[in-house]
Amino acid sequence: MKRLGSVQRKMPCVFVTEVKEEPSSKREHQPFKVLATETISHKALDADIYSAIPTEKVDGTCCYVTTYKDQPYLWARLDRKPNKQAEKRFKNFLHSKENAKEFFWNVEEDFKPAPECWIPAKEIEQINGNPVPDENGHIPGWVPVEKNNKQYCWHSSVVNYEFEIALVLKHHPDDSGLLEISAVPLSDLLEQTLELVGTNINGNPYGLGSKKHPLHLLIPHGAFQIRNLPSLKHNDLLSWFEGCKEGKIEGIVWHCSDGCLIKVHRHHLGLCWPIPDTYMNSRPVIINMNLNKCDSAFDIKCLFNHFLKIDNQKFARLKDIIFDV
């Protein structure tokens, strides 16, 4: 699988942004909007945005595959957040007029405890061996997804550690107009980040599965490249999102040659998300499990078993996949 950038921290917007004092369409109870101006940001220019690879920004929750207990494991995103006292100090600092000075964090005392198995995200700055919080006062990180952890039950539904495989959605290797759901060795995904999408994630913007029969999948970051993107101008991108089938996506992530990731979200352009008919649901999808060795070894209720029952079947769109349980 071709590897692009890894999502280990929040991505900056391709445009310089400004805050407008009107209710957010992205977050309930947020009294302001963050909107893109027409100026491309210095971060984007420094990362050579014009030579970057544009890909679909997928709406789910971020995951990571790395080693745990001497085998490839799926990890869930868990950001360490400040305790109440530290959060209050930080908010006062942000709202003060004399905020030219840098805020001082005491990582050992200011943050809520993390699970023992927690690891900080890669690429974040460290001082004296301690990770430095981001501009929101969070320390991005990961925790391994254990099989019986109810908190991460939807994460664990897409992996099988006995056979070291994961359920992955990507383009069919021989037909870019066809999507494919397959069981991929976790070892092929090592050190990659992916997006978990499905019934119980982020309000299910792609309409996958049902409450009775939930369906979740992993999508490698950068899996869906955008072929005919217009010029990097505010109005051209706005027209593209509004006017063509390929633009019916949450946003764009540019994978830059230096590993930097730059994004634009529909909300940055004043557009709504989620939307009724997404581009992801406009393409046919085929099931290709290729699991002859372990056909009879799965729990009858698990996702892998459900997909084996419809192996090699083709559906007009992802929404049409219904398990006959």
Swiss-Prot record:
Signal peptide: none annotated. Coiled coil: none annotated. This is RNA ligase 1. InterPro entries: RLIG1 (IPR041211). GO terms for molecular function: ATP binding; RNA ligase (ATP) activity. Its cofactor is Mg(2+); Mn(2+). Keywords: ATP-binding, Ligase, Nucleotide-binding, RNA repair. Functions as an RNA ligase, in vitro. The ligation reaction entails three nucleotidyl transfer steps. In the first step, the RNA ligase reacts with ATP in the absence of nucleic acid to form a covalent ligase-AMP intermediate and release pyrophosphate. In step 2, the ligase-AMP binds to the nucleic acid and transfers the adenylate to the 5'-PO4 terminus to form an adenylylated intermediate. In step 3, the RNA ligase directs the attack of the 3'-OH on the 5'-phosphoanhydride linkage, resulting in a repaired 3'-5' phosphodiester and release of AMP. It is an enzyme of class 6 (ligase). It comes from the Eukaryota. Its EC number is 6.5.1.3. PANTHER family: CHROMOSOME 28 C12ORF29 HOMOLOG, RNA LIGASE 1. AMPylates itself (auto-AMPylation). One of its GO terms (biological process) is RNA repair.
